[in-house]
Every structure is written in C-alpha cells, then in structure tokens.
UniProtKB/Swiss-Prot annotation:
SUPFAM superfamilies reported in the protein's UniProt record: Translation proteins (SSF50447)
Family recorded in the similarity comment: Belongs to the universal ribosomal protein uL3 family.
Gene3D superfamilies reported in the protein's UniProt record: 3.30.160.810, Translation factors
Name under which the protein is recorded: Large ribosomal subunit protein uL3
Biological role stated in the UniProt entry: One of the primary rRNA binding proteins, it binds directly near the 3'-end of the 23S rRNA, where it nucleates assembly of the 50S subunit.
Alphabetized InterPro entries for the sequence: Ribosomal_uL3, Ribosomal_uL3_bac/org-type, Ribosomal_uL3_CS, Transl_B-barrel_sf
Entry's Gene Ontology BP terms: translation
PTM field: Methylated by PrmB.
Alphabetically ordered keywords of this record: Methylation, Ribonucleoprotein, Ribosomal protein, RNA-binding, rRNA-binding
Organism: Sodalis glossinidius (strain morsitans)
NCBIfam families, per database record: L3_bact
One Gene Ontology cellular component annotation held by this UniProt entry: cytosolic large ribosomal subunit
C-alpha cells in the first residue's frame, strides 16, 4: 500500500540524546478504514479507497451513508485512494494504522497550502521592487514590462504575474521520520508540511528515498 491519510496537529521540537533540537511536525494518523477495493477486472487498476476521522451523522449525505454502510465502516470526513501492489491483500472494512510507517525512513507529505488571496508579483514571485525615488512615484511594486513588441505581439503563457497565491495542492518530499507513536496514532516528521493546523495530509513513503 502506498500511504495513509493524516491530520496536521502542529509543530514542536524534540531533543536527541546529544541535546540537538529537531523541529518536527506532528501528524495524527487515525486508523484508515478501507471502504472499497478496486481491481483490474472491474475498474482497470488495483487500488483501495479509504476514509479517516469522523463526520456528524447529519452532515453525511445519503449516497455517502449508503457507501459507508455497504463497507460496514463508520462515516469519515472524506474518501481517498491509494494504489496497491500486486499480491497485496486488503479487504473492505479493514483498518490500517500508522504502524505502516514503522520501518520507513523518509516520507512525502501532500496537503493544501495556506491561501494568501490575490497577491502581487513581489509577494507571489519574489520580484524586486523598482526604485523608491529617482522620479518613480507610482510604480514601486508593479511588475514592469510583460512582453516585447509587435513580434511576438502577445504575452507568453506562464508569464509570472499577480494572482491567487496559495490554497493549492503541494507536496514536500523526503522528510525524515523522527518517531512513530503507534499507541497515540502519531507520526513525527522533521521539518514543515503544507497547510494549516487541522488540515488533511496524504503521507506516503518517499519516492526518492
């Protein structure tokens, strides 16, 4: 199996035996419950669908309620999919815990970054500001020229300009696993992960480990 769903609890630090301080992010990984198993015959690929956490009964729509009831699991806060390797046997209703990462050294963590709203080029792309004085009165933080002339006669796609910053899917790769606490369903990784406290995270063994 490729990963688990967790929730960002926050950041703290722990100390090694040598007294070195390590900044860590605490990720709570409650048991992921398998709601569906997909196979080559019916779906064209092998994967499992999981849910995590809980959702109030009055917030569960009827199609979701039926789906969870069919799987025989408690309604969770969402549905996610992970590919599975050939030979891996996973059954509907099975619970998968943070113990999955017991022997993993590095992980990739995916989340939704904090939204910053509409941002200018200085904040969004680290553009330099223009002169504060020397005749410049209104163009201190503007991007400047965005193109050439009649040739090519257009602004190229991908041009860095002002716009929405943040609130997008981001993956941080190869974070060191500092501790796996099976009793408390916690995973401690070195460094920061995307998103706000309480946000959902997808944690997978690192592809570049």
């Amino acid at each position: 199996m490729k990963g688990l769903i967790g929730r960002k609890v926050g950041m703290t630090r722990i100390f090694t035996e040598d007294g070195v301080s390590i900044p860590v992010t605490v990720i709570e990984i409650e048991a992921n419950r398998v709601t569906q198993v997909k196979d080559l015959e019916n779906d064209g690929y092998r994967a499992i669908q999981v849910t995590a956490g809980t959702k109030k009964a009055n917030r569960v729509i009827k199609p979701e309620a039926g789906h969870f009831a069919k799987a025989g699991v408690e309604a969770g806060r969402g549905l996610w999919e992970f590919r599975v390797e050939d030979g891996e046997e996973v059954t509907v209703g099975q619970s998968i815990t943070v113990e999955l990462f017991a022997d993993v050294k590095k992980v990739d963590v995916t989340g939704t970054s904090k939204g910053k709203g509409f941002a200018g080029t200085v904040k969004r792309w680290n553009f330099r500001t223009q002169d504060a004085t020397h005749g410049n009165s209104l163009s201190h933080r503007v991007p400047g020229s965005i193109g050439q002339n009649q040739t090519p006669g257009k602004v190229f796609k991908g041009k860095k300009m002002a716009g929405q910053l943040g609130n997008e899917r981001v993956t941080v790769q190869s974070l060191d696993v500092v501790r796996v606490d099976v009793e408390r369903n916690l995973l401690l990784v070195k460094g920061a992960v995307p998103g706000a406290t309480g946000g959902d995270l997808i944690v997978k063994p690192a592809v570049k480990a």
